[in-house]
Amino acid sequence: MKVVSSLKSLKNRDKSCQVVKRRGKIFVINKKNKKFKARQG
């Protein structure tokens, strides 16, 4: 998982990337391609 300060470019890396908020942190997840995973912070 990548940890970045801005998720704007990471959410556009793949069509099936989605932004979710869990436990007060913002994540980018991708159920089809697991390597596109990131957390803001």
Curated annotation (Swiss-Prot):
One of its GO terms (biological process) is translation. The keyword Ribosomal protein applies. It comes from Orientia tsutsugamushi (strain Boryong). PROSITE patterns: RIBOSOMAL_L36. Pfam families: Ribosomal_L36 (PF00444). Keywords: Ribonucleoprotein, Ribosomal protein. GO terms for molecular function: structural constituent of ribosome. InterPro entries: Ribosomal_bL36, Ribosomal_bL36_sp, Ribosomal_L36_bact. GO terms for cellular component: ribonucleoprotein complex; ribosome. The gene is rpmJ. The lineage of its organism: Bacteria, Pseudomonadati, Pseudomonadota, Alphaproteobacteria, Rickettsiales. Transmembrane segments: none annotated. Belongs to the bacterial ribosomal protein bL36 family. PANTHER family: 50S RIBOSOMAL PROTEIN L36 2 (PTHR47781), LARGE RIBOSOMAL SUBUNIT PROTEIN BL36B (PTHR47781:SF1). This is Large ribosomal subunit protein bL36.
